[in-house]
A protein has these predicted regions:
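Divalent-metal (often Zn2+) His-rich catalytic cores of metallo-beta-lactamase-fold enzymes
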Residues: 121, 131, 147-211, 215-250, ...
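Alpha-helical segment of the N-proximal tetratricopeptide repeat
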Residues: 266-301
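Catalytic core of the metallo-beta-lactamase
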Residues: 14, 70-133, 139-147
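TPR/TPR-like (Sel1-like) alpha-helical repeat modules
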Residues: 317-340
C-alpha cells in the first residue's frame, strides 16, 4: 500500500531530510514479495475483484467496499527513512508525540497502528475499516491470520481505544466519540475471532475447505452491526481462508489430490450428461428456477469442454450476472459481473 507516495512528497524532500517516511518493520521486503513476485497474476485478478472492466451502474460496478474503485495513475515507491522495529515505539515528529504499534500478520504482513496521545486520535491503519476485511483477498495475497488480527485489535482497544476520541483509518470515514469507537473495535475484534474459532471448530468436526463456506454462519449479534457486514471480505472466501491457513488447500479426498485439469476432465462430464444440448436445456431450467449455483456447476463443465460453444458461454454469463447481484460483498459481486 505505497503506490501514491509520490503524489504527496518528492524524493528530493526525503533526501534533504525535510520529510520522513515511516514504515513498519519488514515493509520493503513484503512490498516486493506481494506486488512483484506474483505481480502479473495479481494484477489480472485485481481487475476482477475491483470490477475494472465493467461500467459503473446499478447493473455493473457500484463499489469496491473500502473505496469507490481503483485509482488510476503512476505508481511509486520511496524507501522508509524510519523503520518501526519494536512492538510499541514512541517518536516525536514535528512536535507531535506518536506511539506506533506494529501489527504484523493482520491486514498485511507488515502493518502498524498509531496513537496520538495529545490529540486522543487513534490511527487504525487498515486493521479496522467500515466492513469485515479479507482474510483471503480475491486478487491474490498471502492468507492472513484472523486470530492474530483479533488479538491486535484487542491490544489496541485496551491501550488506546479506551482513551480515543477520534478513530481514523486508511479507508472509509472517521469515528467520533469514545463509546462508538470502543463499540466498533469490539465488534471487529469479535468478528475475526469468531471466524477463526468457529471455522476451526467445524474443521475439527470434519467440515472441509470445499464445504466450510456453506456451513459457517456469522453470529446474529455481529450480522446486526453495520461495521462488520460483508462488504469487502465475505464469510464465503474468508471461511475457506482460515482452513487454508491451518490445513492447506487439500480437502482430504484422494480424488482431489492430483486431479485432471478442468479442460481434460470436462469432456467426459459433458458426454455423461448427454451432450451440450441436454446441458443447455437443464441449465436454462435451473437458471429460470433461480438455482444459479447448480446451473453454474454444469455450464462450467460445458464451457471447459467446448470453449467455442457460444450458447453455453452466454448462459453461464447470465448465471454469473444473477449470482453477482445477490452477494453483499463488492469483491464477490465484481468478480461475477466481470466474468460475465
Amino acid at each position: 500500500h505505497f503506490g501514491g507516495v509520490r503524489g504527496i512528497i518528492t524524493e528530493a524532500e526525503v533526501q534533504a531530510g525535510t520529510v520522513q517516511v515511516i514504515a513498519p518493520t519488514g515493509f520493503m521486503e513484503e512490498a516486493i514479495s506481494e506486488n512483484v513476485y506474483a505481480g502479473n497474476a495479481m494484477s489480472r485478478r485485481a481487475g476482477l475483484q475491483y470490477g475494472r472492466v465493467i461500467p459503473s451502474s446499478p447493473f455493473g460496478q457500484v463499489d469496491s467496499a473500502i473505496g469507490k474503485g481503483l485509482a488510476v495513475g503512476t505508481t511509486g515507491l520511496i524507501a522508509p527513512t524510519l523503520v518501526i522495529e519494536d512492538d510499541f515505539e514512541e517518536h516525536i515528529i514535528d512536535g507531535v508525540r506518536i506511539i506506533f504499534q506494529n501489527t504484523p500478520g493482520t491486514e498485511a504482513p507488515a502493518e502498524m497502528n498509531a496513537w496520538f496521545p495529545q490529540q486522543k486520535v487513534f490511527w487504525a491503519a487498515e486493521n479496522i475499516t467500515a466492513t469485515i476485511h479479507n482474510i483471503y483477498t480475491l486478487r491474490g495475497a498471502l492468507i492472513r491470520d484472523a486470530l492474530v488480527w483479533s488479538k491486535q485489535i484487542n491490544e489496541a482497544l485496551y491501550r488506546y481505544g479506551v482513551q480515543a476520541e477520534v478513530m481514523v483509518s486508511s479507508h472509509n470515514w472517521p469515528r467520533w466519540g469514545n463509546e462508538r469507537i470502543q463499540e466498533i473495535m469490539r465488534a471487529q475484534r469479535d468478528a475475526y475471532a469468531n471466524l477463526n474459532n468457529q471455522v476451526l471448530n467445524l474443521a475439527n468436526q470434519g467440515v472441509t475447505i470445499n464445504e466450510i463456506h456453506n456451513e459457517y454462519e456469522v453470529p446474529l449479534s455481529l450480522q446486526q452491526q453495520w461495521n462488520v457486514r460483508q462488504y469487502h471480505g465475505s464469510e464465503f472466501h474468508n471461511s475457506r481462508a482460515v482452513i487454508n491457513r491451518y490445513l492447506g488447500y487439500w480437502d482430504g479426498n484422494p480424488a482431489t489430490l492430483a486431479p485432471l485439469s478442468p479442460a481434460d476432465s470436462a469432456p467426459l462430464y459433458v458426454e455423461m450428461m448427454g451432450g451440450a444440448d441436454a446441458i443447455l436445456d437443464r441449465a436454462q431450467a435451473l437458471h429460470d428456477g433461480g438455482q444459479y449455483r447448480l446451473a453454474m456447476e454444469i455450464l462450467n463443465k460445458l464451457v471447459y469442454a467446448e470453449p467455442n460453444n457460444s450458447g453455453g458461454k452466454d448462459l453461464l454469463a447470465a448465471v454469473f450476472e444473477q449470482l453477482g447481484y445477490q452477494y453483499e460483498s463488492a469483491s464477490m459481486r465484481n468478480v461475477f459481473l466481470s466474468s460475465a
